[in-house]
Amino acid sequence: MANINFGFEHHASKLYSGAIEEGIQNSLVPMVIETSGRGERAFDIFSRLLRERIIFLGSGIDEHVAGLIMAQLIFLESEDPDRDIFIYVNSPGGSVSAGLGIYDTMQYIRPDVSTVCVGMAASMGAFLLASGAKGKRASLPHSRIMIHQPSGGAQGQESDIIIQAREIEKIRRLLEEIMAKHTGKDVQQVREDSERDRWMDAGEALEYGIIDQVFEKRPAPEKKD
């Protein structure tokens, strides 16, 4: 059976996601204490962000991570189908099937999904960054974005390997068509550009059509009279 991934995930996400998992296991996730008339309540930082309709994708993308992201998207739609959802992306990429599950959910739900790259969006991370609502995709100035073709391993009898190779090519074509739709590039251009790792800074990603704006600094709130 073919196991299709974006190849960069193999040498980038193990250390990255491992550090995240170790931090969680060591209870290093910050807690936020809120006080009300009914006393104090403690939230981990990610749950608190979820209340503000913010989802943080900060690891490699596998089936477990995708399940969490999809569940949060569907939950926030049920809370308010008319308010935007924000996904902050800092990911080296990962499983194609898991990433497509997130992608389909982003397109399926009613709220617009705004995407922001903070740090790195490589491979499937870049794919999801580009998949945000048009006009609502952004990056911080020193983030790095990378696109490339998916990779996959095949094993078994010759006939099985041929079938799996065809499936990998079919998936590659699908990903190129989706990226072309969201960036405004033609499919052949996307194929040529993603033949090898193509790294971009925020300005280059803006020019390519992966994002719509570069955030230098959050605007100061308006002063009340």
Curated annotation (Swiss-Prot):
<dbReference type="InterPro" id="IPR029045">
    <property type="entry name" value="ClpP/crotonase-like_dom_sf"/>
</dbReference>
<keyword id="KW-0645">Protease</keyword>
<dbReference type="InterPro" id="IPR018215">
    <property type="entry name" value="ClpP_Ser_AS"/>
</dbReference>
<feature type="active site" description="Nucleophile">
    <location>
        <position position="123"/>
    </location>
</feature>
<keyword id="KW-0378">Hydrolase</keyword>
<protein>
    <recommendedName>
        <fullName>ATP-dependent Clp protease proteolytic subunit</fullName>
        <ecNumber>3.4.21.92</ecNumber>
    </recommendedName>
</protein>
<dbReference type="GO" id="GO:0051117">
    <property type="term" value="F:ATPase binding"/>
</dbReference>
<comment type="subunit">
    <text>Fourteen ClpP subunits assemble into 2 heptameric rings which stack back to back to give a disk-like structure with a central cavity, resembling the structure of eukaryotic proteasomes.</text>
</comment>
<keyword id="KW-0720">Serine protease</keyword>
<dbReference type="GO" id="GO:0006515">
    <property type="term" value="P:protein quality control for misfolded or incompletely synthesized proteins"/>
</dbReference>
<dbReference type="InterPro" id="IPR001907">
    <property type="entry name" value="ClpP"/>
</dbReference>
<dbReference type="InterPro" id="IPR033135">
    <property type="entry name" value="ClpP_His_AS"/>
</dbReference>
<keyword id="KW-0963">Cytoplasm</keyword>
<dbReference type="Pfam" id="PF00574">
    <property type="entry name" value="CLP_protease"/>
</dbReference>
<dbReference type="InterPro" id="IPR023562">
    <property type="entry name" value="ClpP/TepA"/>
</dbReference>
<dbReference type="GO" id="GO:0004176">
    <property type="term" value="F:ATP-dependent peptidase activity"/>
</dbReference>
<feature type="active site">
    <location>
        <position position="148"/>
    </location>
</feature>
<comment type="similarity">
    <text>Belongs to the peptidase S14 family.</text>
</comment>
<dbReference type="GO" id="GO:0009368">
    <property type="term" value="C:endopeptidase Clp complex"/>
</dbReference>
<comment type="function">
    <text>Cleaves peptides in various proteins in a process that requires ATP hydrolysis. Has a chymotrypsin-like activity. Plays a major role in the degradation of misfolded proteins.</text>
</comment>
<dbReference type="GO" id="GO:0004252">
    <property type="term" value="F:serine-type endopeptidase activity"/>
</dbReference>
<dbReference type="GO" id="GO:0005737">
    <property type="term" value="C:cytoplasm"/>
</dbReference>
